[in-house]
Amino acid sequence: MTIERTLSIIKPNAIKNNALGTIIHRFISANFNIIGMKMLHLTKAQAKGFYTEHQHKSFFNDLINFMISGPIVVLVLESPDAIRRNRDIIGATNPVDAIAGTLRADYADSLIENAVHGSDSLTAAMREINYFFLAGEVYGSMYQ
């Protein structure tokens, strides 16, 4: 199976609710290698740039205001089939639809404040990783 990289974001509500360590532990327990990690407090411009594909949707302003409301942690995860596996661990975007035991079922407060983000495709993963990380800030088997 092909080794992939994906981006995951631990969002402000999960950090505020002291779930950061538990969420990271769950990624590690699922055999992801964390090959890049940063804690950031996004500016409005950074949040708008990251979520640009949603700019014409009704929830855009609420999403941006939430994402700048506190610190986030961005992670580059590496494993075989990383994108699908990360999405499985995260759960459905709407926590009401998330399967018990997924991160969103356990830590999301609402559809907007849904605790975590995960890339949904290889193309998105590459774009999102490059949005937050320079090549020299990501380490792992793909770089050796």
Swiss-Prot record:
Its EC number is 2.7.4.6. GO terms for molecular function: ATP binding; metal ion binding; nucleoside diphosphate kinase activity. Major role in the synthesis of nucleoside triphosphates other than ATP. The ATP gamma phosphate is transferred to the NDP beta phosphate via a ping-pong mechanism, using a phosphorylated active-site intermediate. The active site is at H117. It comes from Baumannia cicadellinicola subsp. Homalodisca coagulata. It is found in: Cytoplasm. It is an enzyme of class 2 (transferase). Keywords: ATP-binding, Cytoplasm, Kinase, Magnesium, Metal-binding, Nucleotide metabolism, Nucleotide-binding, Phosphoprotein, Transferase. Its cofactor is Mg(2+). Its main location: cytoplasm. The keyword Metal-binding applies. It catalyses: a 2'-deoxyribonucleoside 5'-diphosphate + ATP = a 2'-deoxyribonucleoside 5'-triphosphate + ADP; a ribonucleoside 5'-diphosphate + ATP = a ribonucleoside 5'-triphosphate + ADP. This is Nucleoside diphosphate kinase. The keyword Transmembrane helix does not apply. GO terms for cellular component: cytoplasm. The gene is ndk. ATP binds at K11, F59, R87, T93, R104, N114. Belongs to the NDK family.
